[in-house]
Amino acid sequence: MDNSSGQNSRTASSASTSKIVNYSSPVSPGVAAATSSSSSSSSSGMSSSQEDTVLGLFTPKKEFPNAKMLQTIREKLMTPGGACDLLALGIAAEPTDQQPVKLIQQRYLISAQPSHISAAVAAKTPASYRHLVDLTASNLRCVDIFTGEQFLCRIVNEPLHKVQRAYFQLQQHDEELRRSTIYGHPLIRPVHDIIPLTKDRTYILIAPVPQERDSTGGVTGVYENLHTYIRHAKRLCETEARAIFHQICQTVQVCHRNGIILRDLKLKRFYFIDEARTKLQYESLEGSMILDGEDDTLSDKIGCPLYTAPELLCPQQTYKGKPADMWSLGVILYTMLVGQYPFYEKANCNLITVIRHGNVQIPLTLSKSVRWLLLSLLRKDYTERMTASHIFLTPWLREQRPFHMYLPVDVEVAEDWSDAEEDEGTAADAMDDDEEGLCPLGDKHEYEDIGVEPLDYTRSTLQMAQNANGLSTEPEPDTDVDMG
């Protein structure tokens, strides 16, 4: 088939199907030549109907991936000379609603959904702070052409070797550290494959969580993210929030130890993987910065404005990455306990001003230990913030124990009930005798053993800390604000 006849056939095919819109992107001369040669060789022995099948690689978004579409691509890849980048594919529901489709590694088909940031929102964002809004975020869906498996696809703005090194350290080293000390599950979702996109960008294909029964009888899988969960629950009690926040802090700790700055740390990044909504996993390293050494000085400012640290909103070009992550941890903890963000303004300009002042109102209804932890995380001066290596020494998080430690599995039942009651009474008397020597959160010697002085949680101490931060001690009205 010569070029003129192939062109006429394509014109007739597009005219017969009104909802088929060819999508083509610029290609290099080498790829274009390979595409042209493969098309001519594969179409030489085909009938008109078979050629229409090959060219009609378009389907509505809700039907992606279409079985017929995948079968067509399989046949093309198995055709001699057909192993080339298919840069002329696309799926569309309407002629004006196009979605590019890309084939990578001759195996994975990636579909890019439209950005969730509208043009109106982008126009209202001040130019000087536009880096705080992810204007190019897209929901990438990936399917294995040969097995039909579907994966989440994310893009990391780091070269391939750095992403491979980071995931190798997270998944191969520190087996005990990368698992939750409460439930024992992996804190970061494993990846299925890591593929280079450009010299400085990398695809990561996230493996799905298998559906199976866990030890408690619940079904594992991927459930809603933490942001959605809190919107429905309004706010969490301290006991539930402690178990969840413990897993989040452990995730940040293991990343910081391996030279990974998460940067875009927020509630939507964490997903529940059990039916009881107790186990959390961090989705991926999308938006993260992988360090080459110990210096965590960064210049690229990204992240959600509601979680952004004050130093990112200052004129300085650089900032420290690890303290910025700790500020985001404070915002996450505050939102879980109060049911609203500590800094919330409908207009981004006002929000930036509020965050730069660093004034946060902490309700007095919270316990003293968690109020002190919030004050330690939401410090305007980043040099005074709590670090990931010290956060587990705080009394509020030290109250969290692994779930199996709450079950008295090793308790022996006494044969004589009278003897058991007598022993119980003796133990209660001993506790009463020692009560005067204990502080509310434990013995002083308990903290000295780990090199940490006991914290003074008197009202005057909290008053001084709040005055130093410009905080008011008046109780906050018990109202909910839409989390947006």
Curated annotation (Swiss-Prot):
Residues 420-437, 475-484 have a biased composition (Acidic residues). It comes from the Eukaryota. GO terms for biological process: glucose homeostasis; negative regulation of developmental growth; negative regulation of insulin receptor signaling pathway; negative regulation of lipid storage; negative regulation of mitotic nuclear division; negative regulation of phosphatidylinositol 3-kinase/protein kinase B signal transduction; positive regulation of cell size; positive regulation of proteasomal ubiquitin-dependent protein catabolic process. Pfam families: Pkinase. It is found in: Nucleus; Cytoplasm; Cytoplasm, Cell cortex. Changing residue 264 to K: Reduced interaction with Akt1 and reduced inhibition of Akt1-mediated growth. Reduced interaction with slbo and fails to block border cell migration. No effect on cell division in the posterior compartment of the wing. Disruption phenotype: Low viability with only 14% of mutants survive to adulthood. The egg chambers of surviving females often have only eight germline cysts half of which have an oocyte and the other half do not. Early stage 9 to stage 10 embryos, display increased levels of slbo. RNAi-mediated knockdown in embryos produces premature mitosis in part or all of the ventral region, resulting in many mutants displaying defects in gastrulation including partial invagination of the mesoderm. RNAi-mediated knockdown results in an increase in phosphorylated Akt1 but has no effect on total Akt1 levels. Residues 1-51, 420-443, 464-484 are annotated as: Disordered. Changing residue 141 to E: Increased interaction with Akt1 and some negative regulation of Atk1. Increased interaction with slbo but no effect on negative regulation of slbo-dependent border cell migration. Changing residue 141 to Q: Reduced interaction and inhibition of Akt1 resulting in increased Akt1-mediated growth and loss of carbohydrate clearance from the hemolymph. The keyword Nucleus applies. Keywords: Cell cycle, Cytoplasm, Nucleus. PROSITE patterns: PROTEIN_KINASE_DOM. GO terms for cellular component: cell cortex; cytosol; nucleus. One of its GO terms (molecular function) is mitogen-activated protein kinase kinase binding. The keyword Transferase does not apply. Expressed throughout the brain with highest levels of expression detected in the cell body rind and lower levels of expression detected in the neurophil (at protein level). Residues 1-23 have a biased composition (Polar residues). Residues 24-49 have a biased composition (Low complexity). Adapter protein that negatively regulates different signaling pathways to coordinate cell differentiation, proliferation, migration and growth. Functions by binding to key regulatory proteins and either blocks their activity or regulates their turnover by the proteasome. In various developing tissues functions as a cell cycle regulator that mediates cell proliferation according to the requirements of the developmental program. 'tribbles' is named after fictional small round organisms from the Star Trek universe that proliferate uncontrollably. Belongs to the protein kinase superfamily. CAMK Ser/Thr protein kinase family. Tribbles subfamily. Interacts with slbo. Interacts with Akt1. The protein kinase domain is predicted to be catalytically inactive. This is Tribbles. The gene is trbl.
